[in-house]
Amino acid sequence: MASSSTVPLGFHYETKYVVLSYLGLLSQEKLQEQHLSSPQGVQLDIASQSLDQEILLKVKTEIEEELKSLDKEISEAFTSTGFDRHTSPVFSPANPESSMEDCLAHLGEKVSQELKEPLHKALQMLLSQPVTYQAFRECTLETTVHASGWNKILVPLVLLRQMLLELTRRGQEPLSALLQFGVTYLEDYSAEYIIQQGGWGTVFSLESEEEEYPGITAEDSNDIYILPSDNSGQVSPPESPTVTTSWQSESLPVSLSASQSWHTESLPVSLGPESWQQIAMDPEEVKSLDSNGAGEKSENNSSNSDIVHVEKEEVPEGMEEAAVASVVLPARELQEALPEAPAPLLPHITATSLLGTREPDTEVITVEKSSPATSLFVELDEEEVKAATTEPTEVEEVVPALEPTETLLSEKEINAREESLVEELSPASEKKPVPPSEGKSRLSPAGEMKPMPLSEGKSILLFGGAAAVAILAVAIGVALALRKK
């Protein structure tokens, strides 16, 4: 703060009043339990505390006399200066409940706590030598290096009050000299800053700001930064990889928001978050899914991302490449493996379902289950296909979904149906003889053609029935296994 040789007369009066008001706080404060020791190191005892009461009373009386002298000086100079104490915010605050003494006391206490060590060192240096303005100025300037802003203004006031108490205890009367030290120092080194801030009346605003924002000057390393709500709807990519979890970041298109990543992960960009609802499904598959809906709700929601949507035209080709359970067995092997397997209702097996692959050259029948990941390949002889086509009233397009509670026919009913099929098979085989090359050709599991002798009569029907029984038994087992999963 630069030195100022001349200041306005009103500022001089206000500065003098500020110094007297702050020094007068000694008589209003309670004695502390511990006082600064004297230069000889003698501690004050209980008897000396009563002496301090007398000292404080004496200081109060002297300050009151100085204030009366200041009022008289202002009144006498009014005609020449035009300064009216009633218009000054220092002498007459706008708020009657607040006073300059109270504001200075609060600010001075804060400075005393923040600069405790530098102030104590400066006080000891001043008390160890004769009291002069030059010594006071040097010690004050060294102490203000540790302060900034209005705290620099409070440093000389705090030193003056402590010096007044100690020198009065020694029996001296330093009030007049210390008052002059304070006024001169403030006018020389602080006047420019105070005037730029708006004068001494700014002290009241400093007090009100600290009451409204108690932590405004404190530095807090745990500040909480609140993001504005304007851009709350926009989700920007996080800067740190630790913030984003792998299930949100893997295979996520840029156009998709983070809130939809759990059910759009690994989906094509063309498919929206609700595209799975628009894919056409088989009626029997819908029925099967509805029956298992309660059990599937308990599964992890993240499994929705594993659903693979396949067009209906791609199902036959995909089943051949990625079928989980596919069984292609000759009729003889099925008969040997399951000789006593119960047969389900044969009328439900129709000609269209037996020719599901729509490829007459290979004679492979695909039985579609409720799960698109499972397929069952069954091979039947030409005789069995011809026998099945003789019942046009039983033609259906889709094999009904197999239920675990399906009722099986008894042995008598099976024998009766076999006999009826034999009777129907005889005229059909006589009208349309099957070439030996077609009857003997079969598809092995590896896809190679192998010759097979054509069975005649009832043995063909028995072998075909056993094959159908085995096929349906395997299909039921696969369906139950998939539902348990």
Curated annotation (Swiss-Prot):
GO MF assignments: cysteine-type endopeptidase activator activity involved in apoptotic process
Region spans: Disordered: 218-248, 418-451
Motif BH4: where in chain: 14-30
A biological process from GO: regulation of apoptotic process
Post-translational modification Phosphoserine, affected residues: S38, S259, S261, S303, S326, S371, S375, S410, S420, S426, S429, S444
Top-level division of the source organism's lineage: Eukaryota
Motif position, BH3: 100-116
Ranges occupied by A repeats: 246-256, 261-271
Entry's Gene Ontology cellular component terms: membrane; mitochondrial membrane; mitochondrion; nucleus
InterPro entries for the chain: Bcl-2-like_sf (IPR036834), Bcl-2_BH1-3 (IPR046371), Bcl2-like (IPR002475), BCL2L13 (IPR042398)
Motif (BH1): 147-157
Motif (BH2) on chain: 193-206
Compositional bias (Polar residues): 229-248
Keywords of this entry: Apoptosis, Membrane, Mitochondrion, Nucleus, Phosphoprotein, Repeat, Transmembrane, Transmembrane helix
PROSITE patterns: BCL2_FAMILY (PS50062)
UniProt note on tissues of expression: Ubiquitous, with the highest levels of expression in heart, placenta and pancreas.
Family: Belongs to the Bcl-2 family.
Protein name: Bcl-2-like protein 13
Source organism of the structure: Homo sapiens
